[in-house]
Design a protein with these regions (language model features):
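Formylglycine-dependent sulfatase
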Residues: 1-391
């Protein structure tokens, strides 16, 4: 065993800071994540740089703000020349692995929604130290490694490694029960017609009215969270007899919408057990323009509520989304428990730093809104962060 510590880095997608047992959620139980906090340090005011996915993930990897690394919003891949902390760890002798979601490149066919602002000719070039931000590599790319066309029907070309400093990748793209990447190929090996289990058109019956609530037909043991658990445990098995330290990022696509907790996790939590946030009721106060617009869209039946953008909800819809989100987080917590147990089986728990965080949050009823958008509300930019050092 190496005298250098290992790092096991758990990250979820679209996970508010207050949706953990250890952060005081009144209903949700997360005993395994809580156990990390109990032996480490939980940061109560941990804020991300942006209220959506790609800018924050690029900031996490580079330590630089979106205005510097260039991923200003979703649809802009992080430069393959960007120097990441995993590149530094790899160069220093750590084995590096990504199991799950990356989202450092585009995983939809949609590009940037806004052009990059023109460079002011009066600005000076970057000063000393800028060379640390980029890698001295020839060429640039490839940038199609998370493209859905690359992974269609379980057929894919090998990934170009290292991938932003990761020398081992088990990739998941997308969300809910329609996750792609290596997961799609794995699922095809389980079922002759796995596509018949995925998506709203194949869901099981239910009476929920919340937009994007899908009772998936995929069994728990074949849901993306279970795949990530399996691959993370396989990676720990591979590292057990290794003298090199490792850094493993275990990245869950949940609890990002659509709301698709499988099996027992679907109704593990009840809408009637949830409590609307105080900001759901605005009373007689006038709404700011963006909130008023969202309410008007809902009341007119004109709201687009099937995509990625913020939309308004009524009380019942918010409570259902909150309950389903708790179910998705509960499954992630169970997977984390299994992975931590695997770490202990191999005797690596005494030499492994364990971290838990997320890329951004979700309104989940704040101000009668759902999902995320270009607004720096606490529900979107405040995320969990737990660091448990080696004993």
């Amino acid at each position: 065993m190496s005298d250098k510590p290992n790092f096991l880095f758990f990250i979820t997608d679209q996970h508010r800071a207050d949706y953990l047992g250890c952060s005081g959620h009144p209903v949700l139980k997360t005993p395994n994540i809580d156990s990390i906090a109990a032996r480490g340090r939980r940061f109560d005011r941990f804020y991300v740089a942006n209220p959506v996915c790609m800018p924050n993930r690029a900031t996490l990897m580079t330590g630089r703000t979106p205005s510097v690394h260039g991923v200003r919003h979703n649809g802009i891949p992080l430069s393959m020349r960007a120097n990441t902390f995993t590149e530094l760890l790899r160069d220093a002798g750590w084995r590096t692995a990504l199991v799950g979601k990356s989202h450092l490149q585009n995983m939809t066919p949609f590009g940037p929604i806004m052009d990059r602002p023109a460079i002011n000719p009066n600005h000076a070039p970057p000063g000393e130290g800028h060379d640390e931000a980029t890698l001295p590599i020839p060429g640039d790319g490839p940038y199609d490694q998370e493209d859905p066309k690359r992974w269609a029907h379980g057929e894919f070309a090998p990934m170009t490694l290292p991938f932003y400093g990761f020398d081992h990748v088990d990739l998941c793209t997308g969300h809910g029960d329609e996750v792609g990447g290596h997961y799609t190929h794995w699922l095809y090996q389980k079922y002759d017609d796995s596509e018949s289990l995925r998506g709203a058109e194949n869901q099981l019956p239910h009476d929920y009215v919340c937009p994007q609530a899908i009772r998936t037909s995929i069994p728990e043991e074949h849901y993306p969270t279970a795949y990530i658990q399996e691959k993370a445990l396989e990676y720990l098995d591979q590292r057990a007899a290794d003298d090199q330290p490792f850094f493993a990022m275990v990245s869950f696509p949940d609890p990002h919408h659509p709301f698709t907790p499988p099996g027992k996790y679907w109704d593990m939590y009840k809408p009637e057990d949830m409590t609307l946030p105080p900001s759901f009721d605005h009373g007689n106060r006038p709404l700011p323009p963006h909130l008023a617009w969202a309410r008007e869209q809902l009341e007119a039946g004109a709201a687009e509520r099937g995509g990625q953008n913020t939309f308004a909800v009524n009380a019942r819809e918010a409570l259902e989304a909150m309950a389903l989100t708790c179910g998705m987080i509960a499954m992630v917590d169970d997977a984390i428990g299994a992975i931590l147990a695997g770490l202990k089986v191999h005797g690596m728990d005494e030499n492994t730093v364990v971290v838990f965080t997320s890329d951004h949050g979700d309104f989940l009823g704040d101000h009668q809104l759902m999902l995320k958008g270009p607004a720096h509300y606490h529900g979107l930019i405040r995320v969990p962060f737990i660091w448990a050092d080696t004993p």
